[in-house]
């Protein structure tokens, strides 16, 4: 089995925090208090890897899974996704970052100066509550400064070292403008079935030209130490925390979740076929009333331990374990690259548990999917 150095990182989580604000209990209470459900989680999740997350009830496992998929908007930290490239998606935050290079660098310099000032101040103080408060404030500013720096340098790379970045800004904006149009054409081609092959080919040529211009500009500074240093930070992954709602929705095909509670996660007004097929229609994999879709949905149902003839039944007509299988079938129907399974097999019979576990293993080997599973230690040992 290959070690982690040989495998590709699919998700890189750095200092992830998910805090929920508490209601203020006093009229003149100044300080906002929080429930720190997740506080400073850092880990790499690799392609084809099965990650088991074990912990007692209420420790924040479900919150972590939902935050990874941005169902909850994370409070702090970075969640980088490498299943698609920055060029493939061309998210709007890239343009915002490029247009604000100068102001971004200025903000970083101000934060660095503030952190240095606080550090010098608390180092002179004797041990006291005030000193530790100043130290904590300094550390928070340093973290914020580092995050601002990464947000900028991961996109522009070595151009961070230049005093005049106008040419680089223009070329980067040109590249991502073309990439965004190309991404839209590919989506229309898939979703609407419109033949856009000619336009796609033209935009690919434009994108190659834009990338060539950028490489030519980078080559001018290949012997510059500062440029090389900052260029090493350049990252073509997608920062999930900075995506807009619509952009994140586009990635739902890649990332799915099997919810812990089958009762509240299924729409009672939809049949099983409609529930499983909803994502397939939303992502343009099938057209409405397509006979092939019904055949595919029935195939997925059978794999998940549901009889195909149940396709027209509603959730209330099923037992708890069967409802859980509907949720599993809905998630796996899209053949995602990453699945968060929130105690997905805990409500199932032993025979069905092993069937679903084997199905998840097959998904991992066939699709290089990464599966994050929240289990009891006993269930974890079985996988």
For the regions a language model picked out, list residue spans one by one:
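Conserved ABC ATPase "signature" region
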Residues: 291-309
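Conserved catalytic motifs of ABC-family nucleotide-binding domains
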Residues: 335
């Amino acid at each position: 089995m290959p070690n982690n150095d040989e495998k590709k990182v699919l998700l890189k989580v750095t200092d992830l925090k998910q805090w929920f604000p508490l209601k203020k209990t006093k009229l003149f209470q100044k300080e906002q208090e929080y429930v720190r459900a997740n506080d400073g989680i850092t880990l790499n999740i690799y392609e084809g890897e099965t990650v088991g997350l074990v912990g007692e009830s209420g420790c924040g496992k479900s919150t972590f899974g939902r935050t990874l998929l941005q169902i909850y908007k994370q409070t702090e930290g970075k969640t980088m996704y490498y299943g698609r490239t920055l060029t493939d998606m061309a998210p709007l935050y890239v343009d915002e970052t490029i247009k604000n290079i100068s102001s971004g660098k200025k903000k970083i310099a101000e934060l660095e100066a503030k952190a240095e000032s606080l550090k010098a101040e608390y180092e002179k103080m004797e041990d006291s509550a005030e000193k530790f408060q100043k130290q904590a404030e300094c550390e928070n500013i340093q973290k914020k400064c580092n995050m601002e720096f990464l947000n900028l340098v991961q996109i522009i790379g070595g151009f961070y070292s230049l005093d005049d970045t106008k040419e680089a800004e223009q070329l980067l904006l040109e590249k991502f403008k073309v990439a965004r149009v190309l991404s839209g054409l590919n989506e229309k081609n898939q979703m609407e079935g419109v033949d856009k092959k000619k336009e796609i080919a033209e935009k690919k040529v434009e994108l190659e030209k834009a990338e060539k211009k950028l490489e030519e500009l980078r080559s001018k500074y290949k012997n510059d130490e500062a440029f090389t240093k900052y260029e090493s930070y350049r990252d073509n992954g997608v920062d999930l925390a900075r995506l807009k709602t619509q952009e994140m929705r586009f990635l739902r095909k890649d990332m799915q979740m099997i919810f812990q509670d089958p009762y509240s996660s299924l729409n009672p007004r939809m049949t099983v076929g409609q529930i499983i097929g909803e994502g397939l229609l939303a992502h343009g994999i099938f057209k409405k009333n397509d006979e092939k879709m019904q055949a595919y949905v029935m195939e997925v149902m059978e794999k998940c331990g549901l009889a195909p003839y149940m396709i027209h039944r509603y959730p209330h007509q099923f037992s708890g374990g069967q409802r859980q299988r509907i949720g599993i079938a809905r998630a796996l129907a899209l053949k995602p690259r990453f699945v968060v399974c929130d105690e997905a097999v805990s409500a199932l019979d032993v025979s069905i548990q092993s069937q679903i576990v084997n199905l998840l293993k097959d998904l991992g080997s066939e699709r290089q999917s990464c599966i994050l599973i929240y289990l009891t230690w006993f269930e974890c040992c079985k996988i």
